[in-house]
């Protein structure tokens, strides 16, 4: 668990909604964690630090989901899917030219197709924006490595190029933010219109009844299929968000293990993690517990953390409520190996090492362990 706590949080993107056509931004995972925290506050089912860790995990899943949702295969699939809706709608409109429904179903189908095309435009804009940002993030690294290899560059010239590069990236960033804001507003408006359009379509289809089914079967059943797809995908997305939210709250180590297995290494390297202090936990007997409580000035000692791999080990006495890992919610057992981060928070080695491989920040307070290691290396130099 920990000796100090701070927190921060952000959003979840669910890339579905309405027939797989529209991206819907939700905060399902984090809201599920907060709901569980409020529900359990009176019964103390799960303590505050454990809930903060789960909110951080939900945020990490949101970022991963956002990246996966705008990966090339998913974007291509989304584009083909929506294009198929447009093609089918166009074909049915042509084939049903002799049908005269008593409700304006053709208008509804045309509006549905336009929303599909609008969604495709928004997805393409967002995909291009993310690709350009990724290339821009990689270019400073390549330029810095090339500049370090070319020793002939003058210092003033290097500073001038760096300044010009910073200005150029600032202008590109501002332009990207404007485009991103426009695309977000456009997608939000499209989502809102889609919901209203779905209600209108449902009203027209249900009002027409059997007369529509018999007199204009092609238009009628196409509307039924489109409405059904929308309902299916909305229910699927809500159910998926609930399942993942419950999994984050109740089975966080499993989620971390899955991310560790499938995700690329974007956090700390094995060398960075091995540099962090490792401790062994030791439970204390009643007599020793009384002595430790008096020495440390703590009400109820849960055990002692002893530093590993050093001739003069440091020891920390842990209060009873801190003698558990707030990732897996398991109490520390005798001879359990713990990892203490530079911020002072500690967890099971097996739990936190996988987390740091994915994200180099403390799961509780979001302190970046790489900043700490870089600072220490700078001092040694």
UniProtKB/Swiss-Prot annotation:
Recorded topology in the membrane: Multi-pass membrane protein
Localization per Swiss-Prot or TrEMBL: Membrane
Zinc finger (RING-type) stretch: 325-366
Compositional bias (Low complexity): 140-152
GO CC aspect terms: membrane
A Pfam family hit: zf-RING_2
Bilayer-spanning residue ranges: 74-94, 107-127, 189-209, 224-244, 245-265
Assigned keywords, A-Z: Coiled coil, Membrane, Metal-binding, Transferase, Transmembrane, Transmembrane helix, Ubl conjugation pathway, Zinc, Zinc-finger
Entry remark concerning the domains of this protein: The RING-type zinc finger domain mediates binding to an E2 ubiquitin-conjugating enzyme.
Protein name (database record): E3 ubiquitin-protein ligase At1g63170
Organism field: Arabidopsis thaliana
Lineage: Eukaryota, Viridiplantae, Streptophyta, Embryophyta, Tracheophyta
